[in-house]
Amino acid sequence: MSQTLQALADGLPADAFAVLGPKLLADGRRQVRVLAPGAEAMGLIDPRGKLLARMQASAIDGVFEGTLAVDGPYRLRIVWPDRVQEVEDPYAFAATLDESLLLQIAAGDGQALRRALGAQHLHCGDVPGVRFALWAPHAQRVAVVGDFNGWDVRRHPMRQRIGGFWELFLPRVDAGARYKYAVTAADGRVLLKADPVARQTELPPATASVVPSAATFAWTDAAWMANRDPAAVPGPLSIYEVHAASWRRDGHNQPLDWPTLAEQLIPYVQQLGFTHIELLPITEHPFGGSWGYQPLGLYAPTARHGSPDGFAQFVDACHRAGIGVILDWVSAHFPDDAHGLAQFDGAALYEHADPREGMHRDWNTLIYNYGRPEVTAYLLGSALEWIEHYHLDGLRVDAVASMLYRDYGRAEGEWVPNAHGGRENLEAVAFLRQLNRDIATQFPGVLTIAEESTAWPGVTAAISDGGLGFTHKWNMGWMHDTLGYMQRDPAERAHHHSQLTFGLVYAFDERFVLPLSHDEVVHGTGGLLGQMPGDDWRRFANLRAYLALMWAHPGDKLLFMGAEFGQWADWNHDQSLDWHLLDGARHRGMQQLVGDLNAALRRTPALYRGTHRAEGFDWSVADDARNSVLAFVRHDPDGGAPLLAVSNLTPQPHHDYHVGVPRAGLWREILNTDSAHYGGSNLGNSGRLATEPVGMHGHAQRLRLTLPPLATIYLQAEK
């Protein structure tokens, strides 16, 4: 026993519960031992504060011993040099983690992990406290350290459970207390690690975890949540992609907190008519320059914007305003910061040991080991935490292509084939299917959007049909082709017309989102406006035409912040958008156009009901490369009015341009990007146009149109 006590006093591996706390003596009394290095004196008291026994310092430094003659609960009265502390003895409590939960985690159950691990408020009997729990199977010893014990690694060694799990209930730990785990590796190194399942963190660059509030947030979005019905007719989906730390900043160039973002961002998004906000990763991340894409706290909103409750308030306010919230979520890799997941218990745990499997050379990050059920439980639990705890409406899963292929970014000989000799990461495939299965089963109606840049088949196909089960996939091919086309001088566009039309070859193979994202406005490219050719007038006209073409094209929409008013410069994550540009009429016109595009999308079923179905689209003009004109019809599968979109992507206007349409009668121009309202030359088709009974472009009727320069127009059939 003395050896065990000495080991504990030295901070070495030993079974604390074997020697600390109350032990029954042969005569019926209880002997109590407490490890409290630095304490000057100690006593045992009853719950009302009455002294039951004085404790004596033993020969082992920091160990106190005392005997209780009576049965019943006791507390410790510890005299420290600067204060007196009265608290229950953590080593008087039995284990609180249900073994069945631990077995479920070991089988890959994310919900079980959410319930078991991290800093969880609970009562043992009538004693409030926090249970700390983690997974560290290679560790010899784990202790919890924090504000409540002076960060002394000797004070609170944890109880080891089956499967490499550790737990300790600490009475009366307050919300807001900072903590970490002191993990003793097999080789004796002591590693100070943040809690992988922390629900709150310190503000970076500080790295401690924080005990969250015990209070339950009072949501007011019941109506929104009840209406999130996957069986309902699909509505429009138009996403405003936001980096919360740089959308707008305060007077000291600091990120806005969640209440301020709610006050400013939500009305702005409402005004522009977007249906959803997609947040670049707000999971806690040590390096702001990663934009959140190198996270370590997959269960905690970053402290850069305030508390977790502040984020819940933001989501609640979005829902009250009729706006959904999507989180950019990173399950592909993690950074190797010393306080994080890398070598968490002194060995490769969350990552692969072999760098050919475990390291992303492109990003100098580590790859999750999707073959370990506890690791997939950790990732699944994170996804479910954001959806259930924060009422999120979707996850955009980052870098899916890097997960699917073992040779992603690797030369021959730098990767390990799968069990069948192939390049596919079969464990990652299984994980992604489980992710989508869990979300669809437990939270029907929640979106899962894959950023997948290859031609992997069936990303949005049903799992039962061999697919991955995502609800949507980013259409990176469409973005690269069309943006590349628009960056060309109009004089060259005739030779590259297929860049506009090729996307329709595969437009209905997946449920696509058309993304003009943050990736298109960084690394010296300038903003979308700055990437357009020509003088200022032509740049604005090109971008207006491009955005209207995008909004009419099959697929849901995503636009990164700043593009809606024509930011010239690269996006800078360390400063606000250039809001002063809205002093200029053309920038205001661009912003008004985006609002009008979203309004047209919302009120025109032909633009969204058939957006993922081939019967929702017909070409009228696909091959007029010489004039850089294309025209197509969008159909409402439920029989609503069709819409004709026509783009003229040269500065040359066309008069009396004939386009075939599917319905006889009157057609009305409902949007024209060359309108003077948007800063254009105001050429167009005022009023209503009557069809002529002349067959053209596979349709029985035709229209005679005026096509303004560098513009897109929408015309809708009238009843």
Swiss-Prot record:
Superkingdom field: Bacteria
InterPro entries: A-amylase/branching_C, Branching_enzy, GlgB, GlgB_N, GlgB_N_E_set_prok, Glyco_hydro_13_cat_dom, Glyco_hydro_13_N, Glyco_hydro_b
UniProt-listed CDD domains: AmyAc_Glg_BE, E_set_GBE_prok_N
Main EC class the enzyme belongs to: transferase
Keyword Transferase carried by entry: yes
Residue positions of the active site: D398 (nucleophile), E451 (proton donor)
Pfam families: Alpha-amylase, Alpha-amylase_C, CBM_48, GlgB_N
Disulphide-bonded residues: none
An example Gene Ontology CC term for this record: cytosol
The protein's Enzyme Commission number: 2.4.1.18
GO molecular function, one term: 1,4-alpha-glucan branching enzyme activity
Record keywords, A-Z: Carbohydrate metabolism, Glycogen biosynthesis, Glycogen metabolism, Glycosyltransferase, Transferase
Pathway the protein contributes to: Glycan biosynthesis; glycogen biosynthesis
GO biological process: glycogen biosynthetic process
Reactions mediated catalytically: Transfers a segment of a (1->4)-alpha-D-glucan chain to a primary hydroxy group in a similar glucan chain
Keyword Transferase in annotation: yes
PANTHER family to which the protein is assigned, alphabetical: 1,4-ALPHA-GLUCAN-BRANCHING ENZYME (PTHR43651:SF3)
Subunit structure: Monomer.
Main function: Catalyzes the formation of the alpha-1,6-glucosidic linkages in glycogen by scission of a 1,4-alpha-linked oligosaccharide from growing alpha-1,4-glucan chains and the subsequent attachment of the oligosaccharide to the alpha-1,6 position.
Homology family: Belongs to the glycosyl hydrolase 13 family. GlgB subfamily.
Name of this chain's protein: 1,4-alpha-glucan branching enzyme GlgB 2
Biological source species: Xanthomonas axonopodis pv. citri (strain 306)
Classification lineage: Bacteria, Pseudomonadati, Pseudomonadota, Gammaproteobacteria, Lysobacterales
